[in-house]
Amino acid sequence: MRPCRLQLRHCPTLSKGSIDMHIKTVLFATAAAFAAASTPVFAADAIVAAEPEPVEYVRVCDAYGTGYFYIPGTETCLKVSGYLRFEVYGGPDEKGTSDWNARTRAHVQFTAKSDTEYGPLTGLIVIRNNGDNASTNSILDSAYIDIAGFRAGLFYSWWDDDLSGEPDVLSSFETLHNSVRYQYENGDFYAGISVDELEDGYFKDGENPNNVGVALGVGGKAGVVSYQLIGGYDTDNEEGAVRGMIFADIGPGTLGLAGVYASGPNSYYSQSEWTVAAEYAIKATDKWTITPMAQYFGNYVPDLDTFHGNSFDGLGDAWKVGITVDYQIVDNLYAKATVDYTDPDDADEVTKGFFRLQRAF
């Protein structure tokens, strides 16, 4: 075949319809080529999914016991614990002129620990809310820093320790102080000294509760016996108190003995000049514990709310008996009931008690 020229009249072998078809084919091919060439440009504007960030899951920290976990991104271990408690109290004028009162408490504790060259660094915060009918109050129950035996902040003193039952009175009713303390520990033995702000403590007539106290304590465990001996001196009242406690596992339970002597009314002890107490916590079953107790007071103060005397002279004695029953319903759910009877020489006899339901976590 002869080569075809560009002019149509010199291509007699191609009809006009065939030429039109060839032109359309060329145009479609050109458009397709441009579309293919422009595809990368449009692809650059497309939305591309970002790579997912790595997730750091919470890790268990077992260096300080159960319940701790690492705060993400740190080497600090944190534990959250606490309890919910419902109580009903009964007794003469328990609340105002009423002989009974119900209340609910929420108690949450945050404990942070980390390793240092001086040993574990501990920080503790306890928030407590007490609900009584429609009124509630939240308080900072404890908050302190502890490292290498040194502790500073708001915390309960050694005087807050007592027998396992409920009715005994072996300390003042204010054992929570802003304090600085050093406690040496070696195995089952400890000894320490504490300087306490006794702002809410006992004060005499004509004075204000604004004083400082110094407390000493030693304690430990030897076999089936544990013990504690503490003393406190109230610098403003210029009086002091000493207390000893001992516990021994005997038979199906634990025997507890305690004694207190106070030189005069002070912020560490002001209920009486001296007292002795005994209890026996009987482990009846895995779930039941029954604890009877008895206590005798020499030179007993019947009403601490109104007493601001300079000494215990002239006061009568008193004796007290009581019983506490503890029952574990299920894991972390407990019930407690207690009742006690007090017979003072200088006041009316008193019978009171309470029932408690508590869920720990």
Each model region followed by its residue ranges:
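N-terminal periplasmic/intermembrane-space "pro-region" immediately following the signal or transit peptide
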Residues: 2-81
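Outer membrane beta-barrel
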Residues: 67-200, 217-221
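Detector for outer-membrane/organellar transmembrane beta-barrel domains
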Residues: 209-320
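Gram-negative outer-membrane beta-barrel proteins
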Residues: 88-94, 116, 131-133, 158-162, ...
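Outer-membrane beta-barrel "beta-signal"
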Residues: 41, 327-329, 349-361
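Hydrophobic, lipid-facing positions within transmembrane beta-strands of outer-membrane proteins
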Residues: 104-108, 141-143, 148, 176-180, ...
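Repeated loop/turn-to-beta-strand initiation elements of outer-membrane beta-barrel proteins
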Residues: 117-120, 148-152, 188-193, 222-229, ...
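Transmembrane beta-barrel strands of outer-membrane/channel proteins
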Residues: 84-88, 125-129, 152-156, 193-197, ...
